[in-house]
Curated annotation (Swiss-Prot):
Belongs to the class-I aminoacyl-tRNA synthetase family. TyrS type 1 subfamily. It comes from Citrobacter koseri (strain ATCC BAA-895 / CDC 4225-83 / SGSC4696). GO terms for cellular component: cytosol. Its main location: cytoplasm. This is Tyrosine--tRNA ligase. GO terms for molecular function: ATP binding; RNA binding; tyrosine-tRNA ligase activity. The gene is tyrS. Homodimer. It comes from the Bacteria.
Length: 428
């Protein structure tokens, strides 16, 4: 069940969900929220052609504020993306070309759009790009109007920068050092243009956010606020949002809806109820009831399926969720008749291990090439023991050669050894 957060105690509700790492002048912010709707913003730098799971918590926070009646501004950093944020980064970022960054800006703007409502009256969301105010600014204006308000002493003492300065092998370029000024000016600019009074971001952005608060006060004599969401960690200490294949992306072309769904299904019991608070709009009482039910049911917990459904629907829509569940069910029961060509394309993208083979190959060779078996001899024994299926149908003849009828949609054959070991053959 989705809920609309009451604006008057919104900060408290976010804290109950574990979504507040730090907040400036919490009492004054709570008072301001109680007075009526505000405008707030969160920035997304185009450092890749897609957002990833690390962006999801602040993005959903924007949505939570909008549901409570506030006006969200999604800022895509067309200018800051050309510079690179040094915050807590061990080394200098590679600079991307203007054309590349512009292409990524367009993709990220489209990605952000479905999460917010851009047509709901007074609190309709706004999409902004900081290249609009930095693109035409000359260096003298930057140094005189922005630079003069920043103390280098304070800047080098910010934790995010200090870590780089203290390393013998990695310093920091003036380019990245100036990033703090750019993000600070974003806040001041959005305050003037749209009346923005709150910036939200990840906990690594605290130094940049407080710089923006100070600059807005100096330039416009306005009180503004900052709130950071926590860095998501897993109970076992490993990094959240990563798989063996790398980051989990929001773009379905980079991480398929099936793979995305499976990522959440595989959430550890120690993390799942916390993640339901972070990544869904379920009421806290409902999450607690689910935890109690799982604890007492004596069966496998239901929470992972609820989490996977909720987040996959949020990111990939009903169609993406239905496809992910259909593929999951088909792989589990071995019946592939319900799978569409698009479903096989998801599997080929990142769903199961995939190999390419020339037509006319035999089953033993396919098992070896796919690394489902180490040798033809072992493959022969496995096939004879009835442990291999082709598209869900058992095949016990070690001398079997693939037939045209084994090739689905003119391209695909799904092999399985045992219950869980899959490989998708893509025929050349």
């Amino acid at each position: 069940m989705e809920i609309l957060m009451a604006s008057s105690n919104l900060i408290k509700q976010l804290q109950e969900r574990g979504l507040v790492a730090q907040v400036t002048d919490e009492e004054a912010l709570a008072e301001r929220l109680a007075q009526g709707p505000i405008a707030l913003y969160c920035g997304f730098d185009p450092t890749a052609d897609s957002l990833h799971l690390g962006h999801l918590v602040p993005l959903l926070c924007l949505k939570r504020f909008q549901q409570a009646g506030h006006k969200p501004v999604a800022l895509v950093g067309g200018a800051t993306g050309l510079i690179g944020d040094p915050s807590f980064k061990a080394a200098e970022r590679k600079l991307n070309t203007e054309d590349t960054v512009q292409e990524w800006v367009d993709k990220i703007r489209k990605q952000v759009a479905p999460f917010l409502d851009f047509d709901c009256g007074d609190n309709s969301a706004i999409a902004a790009n900081n290249y609009d105010w930095f693109g035409g600014m000359n260096v003298l204006t930057f140094l005189r109007d922005i630079g003069k308000h920043f103390s280098v002493n304070q800047m080098i003492n910010k934790e995010a920068v200090k870590q780089r300065l203290n390393r013998d092998d990695q310093g920091i370029s003036f380019t990245e050092f100036s990033y703090n000024l750019l993000q600070g000016y974003d806040f001041a600019c959005l305050n003037k243009l749209h009346g923005v009074t709150l910036q939200i971001g990840g906990s690594d952005q605290w130094g940049n956010i407080t710089s923006g608060i100070d600059l807005t006060r100096r330039l416009h004599q306005n009180q503004v606020f900052g709130l950071t969401v926590p860095l998501i960690t897993k109970a076992d200490g490993t990094k959240f949002g990563k798989t063996e294949g790398g980051a989990v992306w929001l773009d379905p072309k980079k991480t398929s809806p099936y793979k995305f769904y499976q990522f959440w299904i595989n959430t550890a019991d120690a993390d799942v109820y916390r993640f339901l608070k972070f990544f869904t709009f379920m009421d806290i009482a409902e999450i607690n009831a689910l935890e109690e039910e799982d604890k007492n049911s004596g069966k496998a917990p239901r929470a992972q399926y609820v989490l996977a459904e909720q987040v996959t629907r949020l990111v990939h829509g009903e169609e993406g969720l239905v496809a992910a569940k259909r593929i999951t069910e088909s792989l589990f029961n071995g019946n592939l008749s319900d799978l569409s060509e698009a479903d096989f394309e998801q599997l080929a993208q990142d769903g199961v291990p995939m190999i390419e083979m020339e037509k006319g190959a035999d089953l033993m060779q396919a098992l070896v090439d796919s690394e489902l078996q180490p040798s033809r001899g072992q493959a022969r024994k496995t096939i004879a023991s009835n442990a291999v299926t082709i598209n869900g149908e058992k095949q016990s003849d070690p001398e079997y050669f693939f037939q045209d009828s084994d090739i689905l949609f003119g391209r695909y054959t799904l092999l399985r050894r045992g219950k869980k070991n899959y490989c998708l053959i893509c025929w050349k």
